[in-house]
Amino acid sequence: MGNHKAALTKQVFTFASELYAYGVREVVISPGSRSTPLALAFEAHPNIKTWIHPDERSAAFFAVGLIKGSERPVAILCTSGTAAANYTPAIAESQISRIPLIVLTSDRPHELRSVGAPQAINQVNMFNNYVSYEFDMPIADDSKETINAIYYQMQIASQYLYGPHKGPIHFNLPFRDPLTPDLNATELLTSEMKILPHYQKSIDASALRHILNKKKGLIIVGDMQHQEVDQILTYSTIYDLPILADPLSHLRKFDHPNVICTYDLLFRSGLDLNVDFVIRVGKPVISKKLNQWLKKTDAFQILVQNNDKIDVFPIAPDISYEISANDFFRSLMEDTTINRVSWLEKWQCLEKKGRKEIKCYLEQATDESAFVGELIKKTSEKDALFISNSMPIRDVDNLLLNKNIDVYANRGANGIDGIVSTALGMAVHKRITLLIGDLSFYHDMNGLLMSKLNNIQMNIVLLNNDGGGIFSYLPQKESATDYFERLFGTPTGLDFEYTAKLYQFDFKRFNSVSEFKNATLLSETSTIYELITNREDNFKQHQILYQKLSEMIHDTL
């Protein structure tokens, strides 16, 4: 028994130390019995912060938010059985978004697998469709090889925690009873750092000269790291190229004449220009209309992503580069320039007139977009916005026009689950205001527990149209009229004031845009600001804006 405890202690303390060595500073633990050894090891480590969340699904999304906020890998730990399966949505989001989430599932020892033991399911390779690397660790024993396996496996897995190969990894860890390590053996807990991998590549720019020397070019930038924007702006300035900047690109923070923000509304309202080449940077953009245009255009398309697995949506490019945006554009700098002034001025004219139409619209609108416009005005440069999927991110795409605020969202799998938890994870490291719809909020209300337990401050702006507003913009609205409200509108009639009381949030309800205009978003407390809207009215008012922009485009071109 003594040998077992010593072996278990050395294994889990070594494992915790190795995670620290590769940059882990936070672990989110969901309580359970089988995870006892590692939970105690993390709790005992002097330089690892532990978070406790009883719901595995929300815990995993909370960790995703921690990673977004800290830009470091974060580990999650749960007990054996179906607890692990609840991690799946967040792992899928992490895989598509290249988020270094370290998944640690505790397991029954091998002799208790597939024999009917309680809380024992097949956990080996259970996430293999969504993780970059996985390994079923050996059980603790006295052999040197068991400890060496930790060193070897962490070294292999570390390539997926940094650089272009980033993504979630999974370690399944079986533990045999008794489960308590020796908490006095703290000398085994170390805080040494490994040399982390560094990735940088250059390109042969000569292969692109004949393409980039053409006049009508665009730079389209999706979700990407804020550290990569400098060279994009420099290249755009030198070569007179418009930048169509997604709200998650971090480029709308800059008051730069080449940054185009109204493109979604312009394409939605009938814009269709001939283009020679497109440089696509980062993840796919949010705008459905821009993605549809990319699918049909004859322009030569260059894709730049700092990933080992290129996301080609909405269409495969003519050529792609696995390289950072800064390195790519730095490689293209040359002495000669192309005169594209008239091409750039055409886009700048459309942008200026588009902004004017949006401003006039917002001065009179009473729908959700008017609420979103007011929220953007109220958000200070010290704060960041986390935007839920569905309609909120689309309204922000249309209405965020060059303001120095950071915008974040879960745009990997684009799901509505785990939004509250992800935003709260980010709120640990940044001042965050969450913009979310009522169905997305309902889906992750239990995520609010982390705010209550840990005093994490975050304001929530809740757009409540009592259902799924985005479906009003889809063909189902007209083709399935008799069934639409039951199958797609899905009203719930929930009173979210009770949710606020349950999780000790302040609560304010606004029934009109004029009421919200006079409100102050407090930074000292956690408050839910509920904005009551109407789905049908939202749809009708959006159509008015599209028509105004369509007329503007017709008069301009």
From Swiss-Prot:
One of its GO terms (molecular function) is thiamine pyrophosphate binding. Catalyzes the thiamine diphosphate-dependent decarboxylation of 2-oxoglutarate and the subsequent addition of the resulting succinic semialdehyde-thiamine pyrophosphate anion to isochorismate to yield 2-succinyl-5-enolpyruvyl-6-hydroxy-3-cyclohexene-1-carboxylate (SEPHCHC). This is 2-succinyl-5-enolpyruvyl-6-hydroxy-3-cyclohexene-1-carboxylate synthase. The keyword Transmembrane helix does not apply. Disulfide bonds: none annotated. CDD domains: TPP_PYR_MenD, TPP_SHCHC_synthase. The keyword Metal-binding applies. Its EC number is 2.2.1.9. It is an enzyme of class 2 (transferase). Pathway: Quinol/quinone metabolism; 1,4-dihydroxy-2-naphthoate biosynthesis; 1,4-dihydroxy-2-naphthoate from chorismate: step 2/7; Quinol/quinone metabolism; menaquinone biosynthesis. Belongs to the TPP enzyme family. MenD subfamily. It comes from Staphylococcus aureus (strain JH9). Its cofactor is Mg(2+); Mn(2+); thiamine diphosphate. The lineage of its organism: Bacteria, Bacillati, Bacillota, Bacilli, Bacillales. SUPFAM superfamilies: Thiamin diphosphate-binding fold (THDP-binding). It catalyses: isochorismate + 2-oxoglutarate + H(+) = 5-enolpyruvoyl-6-hydroxy-2-succinyl-cyclohex-3-ene-1-carboxylate + CO2. Binds 1 thiamine pyrophosphate per subunit. Homodimer. Pfam families: TPP_enzyme_C (PF02775), TPP_enzyme_M_2 (PF16582), TPP_enzyme_N (PF02776). Keywords: Magnesium, Manganese, Menaquinone biosynthesis, Metal-binding, Thiamine pyrophosphate, Transferase. One of its GO terms (biological process) is menaquinone biosynthetic process.
